[in-house]
Amino acid sequence: MWARLLLHVAYILIPLLGSSARGYTGRKAPGHYSAERRRLGPHVCLSGFGSGCCPGWAPSMGSGHCTLPLCSFGCGSGICIAPNVCSCQDGEQGATCPEAHGSCGEYGCDLTCNHGGCQEVARVCPVGFLMTETAVGIRCADIDECLSSSCEGHCVNTEGGFVCECGPGMQLSADRHSCQDTDECLGTPCQQRCKNSIGSYKCSCRAGFHLHGNRHSCIDVNECRRPQERRVCHHTCHNTVGSFLCTCRPGFRLRSDRVSCEAFPKAVLAPSAILQPRQHPAKMSLLLPEAGRPALSPGHSPPPGAPGYPTGVRTISQPSTTQVLPTFFPTQLISTPVPSSSPLGTLGPPSLLQGAVGTPSSPRGPESPKLGAGSSSCWHLGATYESGSRWNQPGCSQCLCQDGEVTCGGVRCDATCSHPVPPRDGGCCPSCTGCFHSGAIRAEGDVFSPPEENCTVCVCLAGNVSCISPECPPGPCKASPQSDCCTCVPGRCYFHGRWYTDGAVFSGGGDDCTTCVCQNGEVECSFTPCPELECPREEWLLGPGQCCFTCREPTPTTGCSLDDNGVEFPIGQIWSPGDPCELCVCQADGSVSCKRTDCVDSCPHPIRIPGQCCPDCSAGCTYTGRIFYNNETFPSVLDPCLSCICLLGSVACSPVDCPITCTYPFHPDGECCPVCHDCNFEGRKVVNGQVFTLDDEPCTRCICQLGEVSCETVPCRPICTDPSCPDSVFPLEEKQQPSPHGELAKAARNARGDTEVPVNCSSCPGPPSASPTRPMVHLLQRLLRTNLSNIQSASPSPPIAQTSSSPLLEPEGISLGKPRASQPPEPSAGSPVSPRLSTLPPAIPGTPLSPVTPESSSSTFGTQTAFQWLLSATPLTEAETPSMTNADLSETLTTSSSSQRLSAALPDTPNPVPQQSTIDTPKKENSTI
């Protein structure tokens, strides 16, 4: 019984230990002053001037080492394992641990079931619950705070509270109620440029790139693939990422615009005195270096008899008296001897000079190089320098080439160190190897003291001198008369950032528990002795600001009462009044002390754990109202074409990876990735299979095929110079004759041989290979040709009345009967019959030849029309040819002696006669055969 009571008292006393108070065991009798110079073990502070336990630690009862941690709020049913860190029974760690619940919970009632309470013990409901009395006691019902909440976005009611959520593109502010715009650009969703907007963002690309169909990536623009009329380079174009590079063919060089090319001679032309302004000195005569002959330097003439140099050509050094000629330079060297009467002694006669150089009115051709004042290179001391280049010359001079002129001056030296060494041995600029200090040169790494400053130590490093003076430690004055760098300083002590005079006594830890003394520059501290206690260790109490433990007074019977709802908490009880960020403790005097924890948002999308004060960034992310774990990927709600990942409370989104297998993919609306079906050609959609022409190239025809675009030049129809007619009608006898239009035409003789019909491009529809012939029509045409060759020798027979109404032999799909579309009227008995119609033989061999008379023309008109169609019909395709074997065809042709049997042997289809087989008049028929 007593053991349980003592244990209960110990649980109450331990949480009352403060971080600023210390308890020490094993002290000597009161009145005994002990100066402990050093304390051994871990967690010891003030080592060297006395020692004590660091804040948050206390000496243990056995060894006296500082190994007993102190927890300010107590650990309840847990164990204090570090300063203000408790290890609870459920394995969690925190500033405190909940008390072990018995029949009643933390609030005096079991709130785990229906949020109820115990009427006899306490009547309390947590914040967010409404207390109601029932027949079985107190019941706590959840309050829907969303009915009157101040959420700017969407309110979600929870048990005991509510949570505010924001829509897409917005995030919750620090007040947990209002919404603010989410800067999506921080997650780098765009490849190049990103512009944030309220609830959204927009990607763009730099110059030389265009936005991909996914609206996030940037694709390089190939400037070199433009048509010839819009090409960017004069000669050759090389595409680069985001730009392009132009090059020129041999003999040309790029102009300043880096796009066009100009002619450039292979030989180096030296600037000449005659082509320079009056105010500029001459540098070199007009002399071109050739193979086997080097160029001359200014002020030097070629040696006598030197090979490769023409006689009389030399360099000059006197100023020029001739103005610049606004003409182009000659590209050939003038190798005429210089006469003695020449004012400069460098060039040939005026006639040769004028012919070679030109006059002011001479045009400047595109292949002529431009030199003189506008030249982009310089010739100096036998070398060529580009315009804008600088170089050093012997004698500490620096030269500059600018627009063909060389300007030399003194070398400008920029010192890169504080103490450079002056130049030696003909040098131009000082050196930073070594130091020049106080009139003396110091070697690299030399340590020295300046004159009259023995207490100052300097070092030379890379031309810089750094000096330091020794800092004299405090201490008593020395009796030695020898002078040194440090002066005599009275004894002082420096302790915890403050100086104390010799003999001063002060508190070491900011309280009265430690006493320190400054003696001869050293601090000695000792702890205040504590009396021995007669009460057991469990009843020790260390009050605020006290140095020694005292025995606990009898515990008062009352704790901390809350007047609003009648709840009473025992002394030392820690609870949260409803907000997990606020903790309250019941003090020993019955007062309640509450402290609120301020949370700092360390990530944009933390997770709020119920019952936990601050959001947690390590558990995952809360994004668009959903919770994601770390390293979890998910599609973006703002843009389905983005893939996002959660990383420690932060969300990073990037475009979905789209595999593209074609050159011109088209990105349909609402799709994340472009597809290789239609084409996106120069920003416009081209349907698959569509043929189109370029806007600036009407003669170029392109076609879109599954995301690829291929172009070709449209072939133009050649002029008709040698027409030909199909040979499937009947044999022609051709001869050349001029056409009325001045073209070379042909003449075709008809079947009787007495009429020549002129043939030109308009009368011949095209070569017979335009469409394949059908076997049946071709066979009938051959039969007609055979009968036509014997028609002149055939004797007339008595007219045979054709009473059969059976159709003639017809190919499949072609009706050989009367035309349906434009059938001519039947001729009357007295009307003349066309000679051609009267000479047509029967269609089948073995049938008697019957001359056509006016009486029989009406009955035989269908047969004649069919024969005429066979002579002029366009061959059909093989797909339209009737299915018939050669055996069936030969059997039909050899056993049938009438058109009725032929028509019965072959299939007959009622298809109409083609448009081109319709015969209007006999005259028109003869003109087309």
UniProtKB/Swiss-Prot annotation:
SUPFAM superfamilies xrefs: FnI-like domain (SSF57603), Growth factor receptor domain (SSF57184)
Keywords: Calcium, Disulfide bond, EGF-like domain, Glycoprotein, Repeat, Secreted, Signal
Localization per Swiss-Prot or TrEMBL: Secreted
Glycosylation site list: N454, N464, N787
InterPro entries (alphabetical): cEGF, EGF-like_Ca-bd_dom, EGF-like_dom, EGF-type_Asp/Asn_hydroxyl_site, EGF_Ca-bd_CS, Growth_fac_rcpt_cys_sf, vWF_C/EGF_Fibrillin, VWF_dom
Key word Secreted present: yes
Domain VWFC: 376-433, 433-494, 491-552, 558-618, 619-677, 677-762
Polar residues biased stretches: 791-807
Domain of life the protein comes from: Eukaryota
Function: May be a regulatory element in the beta-catenin signaling pathway and a target for chemoprevention of hapatocellular carcinoma.
Protein's UniProt name: von Willebrand factor C and EGF domain-containing protein
Source species: Mus musculus
Gene designation per UniProt: Vwce
